[in-house]
Amino acid sequence: MLGVQAQMPAPGQWTTPPFDPRFPNQNQTRNCYQNFLDYHRCVKTMDRRGKNTQACDYYFRVFHSLCPVSWVQRWNEQIKQGTFPGKI
Protein backbone atom coordinates (compact mmCIF):
# COMPACT_ATOMS: atom_id res chain seq x y z
CA MET A 1 0.00 0.00 0.00
CA LEU A 2 2.99 2.28 0.45
CA GLY A 3 3.52 2.39 -3.33
CA VAL A 4 0.01 3.73 -3.88
CA GLN A 5 0.50 6.49 -1.32
CA ALA A 6 3.78 7.49 -2.96
CA GLN A 7 2.02 7.93 -6.33
CA MET A 8 -0.73 10.21 -4.98
CA PRO A 9 -0.28 13.92 -5.68
CA ALA A 10 -1.08 16.60 -3.14
CA PRO A 11 -4.79 17.41 -2.69
CA GLY A 12 -6.08 19.67 -5.45
CA GLN A 13 -3.48 18.51 -7.97
CA TRP A 14 -5.12 16.15 -10.46
CA THR A 15 -2.95 14.03 -12.70
CA THR A 16 -3.53 11.37 -15.31
CA PRO A 17 -4.18 8.01 -13.62
CA PRO A 18 -1.32 5.52 -13.89
CA PHE A 19 -1.53 2.58 -16.29
CA ASP A 20 -3.72 -0.25 -15.03
CA PRO A 21 -2.82 -3.60 -16.63
CA ARG A 22 -6.41 -4.82 -16.17
CA PHE A 23 -7.46 -2.31 -18.86
CA PRO A 24 -4.81 -2.26 -21.62
CA ASN A 25 -7.08 -0.91 -24.37
CA GLN A 26 -7.64 2.70 -25.32
CA ASN A 27 -11.32 2.62 -24.31
CA GLN A 28 -11.30 3.40 -20.58
CA THR A 29 -15.05 3.11 -19.93
CA ARG A 30 -14.71 -0.14 -17.99
CA ASN A 31 -11.76 1.26 -16.06
CA CYS A 32 -13.89 4.24 -15.02
CA TYR A 33 -16.77 2.03 -13.85
CA GLN A 34 -14.50 -0.45 -12.04
CA ASN A 35 -12.71 2.28 -10.10
CA PHE A 36 -16.09 3.79 -9.14
CA LEU A 37 -17.13 0.38 -7.76
CA ASP A 38 -13.75 -0.16 -6.08
CA TYR A 39 -14.00 3.21 -4.32
CA HIS A 40 -17.47 2.55 -2.93
CA ARG A 41 -16.53 -1.01 -1.91
CA CYS A 42 -13.42 0.30 -0.17
CA VAL A 43 -15.36 2.98 1.73
CA LYS A 44 -18.03 0.46 2.75
CA THR A 45 -15.41 -2.02 3.99
CA MET A 46 -13.37 0.59 5.88
CA ASP A 47 -16.49 2.06 7.52
CA ARG A 48 -17.63 -1.40 8.56
CA ARG A 49 -14.23 -2.09 10.14
CA GLY A 50 -14.11 1.33 11.79
CA LYS A 51 -10.96 2.36 9.94
CA ASN A 52 -10.00 5.57 8.17
CA THR A 53 -11.18 5.74 4.54
CA GLN A 54 -8.11 7.68 3.39
CA ALA A 55 -6.81 4.52 1.68
CA CYS A 56 -9.78 4.77 -0.71
CA ASP A 57 -8.72 8.20 -2.01
CA TYR A 58 -6.70 6.59 -4.83
CA TYR A 59 -9.84 5.07 -6.37
CA PHE A 60 -11.69 8.37 -5.90
CA ARG A 61 -9.04 10.29 -7.81
CA VAL A 62 -8.89 7.73 -10.62
CA PHE A 63 -12.61 7.54 -11.27
CA HIS A 64 -12.94 11.33 -11.05
CA SER A 65 -10.18 11.64 -13.66
CA LEU A 66 -11.65 9.04 -16.03
CA CYS A 67 -15.43 9.28 -15.66
CA PRO A 68 -17.67 11.99 -17.12
CA VAL A 69 -19.32 14.05 -14.37
CA SER A 70 -22.80 13.20 -15.64
CA TRP A 71 -22.14 9.46 -15.17
CA VAL A 72 -20.89 9.93 -11.61
CA GLN A 73 -23.89 12.10 -10.72
CA ARG A 74 -26.30 9.54 -12.17
CA TRP A 75 -24.60 6.63 -10.39
CA ASN A 76 -24.63 8.50 -7.07
CA GLU A 77 -28.34 9.24 -7.50
CA GLN A 78 -28.98 5.57 -8.27
CA ILE A 79 -27.07 4.54 -5.13
CA LYS A 80 -29.20 6.89 -3.01
CA GLN A 81 -32.40 5.55 -4.60
CA GLY A 82 -31.27 1.93 -4.25
CA THR A 83 -31.43 1.27 -8.00
CA PHE A 84 -27.70 1.11 -8.80
CA PRO A 85 -27.07 -2.08 -10.80
CA GLY A 86 -23.50 -2.71 -9.60
CA LYS A 87 -22.47 -4.78 -6.58
CA ILE A 88 -21.11 -2.53 -3.87
UniProtKB/Swiss-Prot annotation:
Q: What is its main location?
A: mitochondrion
Cysteines paired by S-S bonds:
32-67, 42-56
Q: How does it sit in the membrane?
A: Peripheral membrane protein
What CDD domains has UniProt attached to this entry?
Cyt_c_Oxidase_VIb
Where is it localised?
A: Mitochondrion inner membrane
Q: Does the keyword Membrane apply?
A: yes
Which GO terms are recorded in the biological process aspect for this UniProt protein? oxidative phosphorylation
Query: Has keyword Disulfide bond?
Result: yes
A GO cellular component entry from the record: mitochondrial crista
Tissue specificity annotation:
Testis specific.
Q: Which UniProt keywords apply?
A: Disulfide bond, Membrane, Mitochondrion, Mitochondrion inner membrane
Q: Where are the residues of the annotated region Disordered?
A: 1-21
Q: Which domain of life is it from?
A: Eukaryota
Q: Gene3D superfamilies annotated for this entry? A: Cytochrome c oxidase, subunit VIb
Pathway membership: Energy metabolism; oxidative phosphorylation
Question: Which InterPro entries does the protein's record reference?
Answer: COX6B-like (IPR048280), CX6/COA6-like_sf (IPR036549), Cyt_c_oxidase_su6B (IPR003213)
Instruction: Show the stretches that span the lipid bilayer.
Output: none
Described purpose of this protein according to its UniProt entry: Component of the cytochrome c oxidase, the last enzyme in the mitochondrial electron transport chain which drives oxidative phosphorylation. The respiratory chain contains 3 multisubunit complexes succinate dehydrogenase (complex II, CII), ubiquinol-cytochrome c oxidoreductase (cytochrome b-c1 complex, complex III, CIII) and cytochrome c oxidase (complex IV, CIV), that cooperate to transfer electrons derived from NADH and succinate to molecular oxygen, creating an electrochemical gradient over the inner membrane that drives transmembrane transport and the ATP synthase.
Protein family per UniProt:
Belongs to the cytochrome c oxidase subunit 6B family.
Quaternary structure per UniProt? Component of the cytochrome c oxidase (complex IV, CIV), a multisubunit enzyme composed of 14 subunits. The complex is composed of a catalytic core of 3 subunits MT-CO1, MT-CO2 and MT-CO3, encoded in the mitochondrial DNA, and 11 supernumerary subunits COX4I, COX5A, COX5B, COX6A, COX6B, COX6C, COX7A, COX7B, COX7C, COX8 and NDUFA4, which are encoded in the nuclear genome.
* UniProt-recorded name of the protein: Cytochrome c oxidase subunit 6B2
Q: Which organism is it from?
A: Rattus norvegicus
Q: Which gene encodes it?
A: Cox6b2
